[in-house]
Amino acid sequence: MRGTSPGGPTDLVVIRTAHTSPYENLGLEQYLTGQAAPGQCILYLWQNRPTVVIGRNQNVWAECRPEAMEEDGVLLARRLSGGGAVYHDLGNLNFTFIARSALYSVPRHLEVILKSLSLLGIPGEISGRNDLTV
């Protein structure tokens, strides 16, 4: 898929995985981080089985209850980036945009997602900080 950006043409590569392991998905996300060529944007779409994902600097015991998670079959994973603790399951679709800094634009990337949803007949809106609601 090709688009345009203020810096010129952009190639959009969409990668969707069927894996639901948070460890495989976060590992692939980390690998893809270094793979965007100049002028290329990678959109990575993925889902996890029930998992709490915490940020690089978070304390597991301050953010969640590991014993209860184990009883409920909820996995725990840590991403290499910062940010808060989030719950993932098969009811949400995670997306990661990967691009060199000249092409990186959160508002632009969210608009790509909204336009794609609209083409599928799914209304959506930007809500909160970097979130989409459908």
Predicted feature residues:
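Catalytic beta-strand/loop module used to bind and position nucleotide/cofactor moieties
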Residues: L90-V134
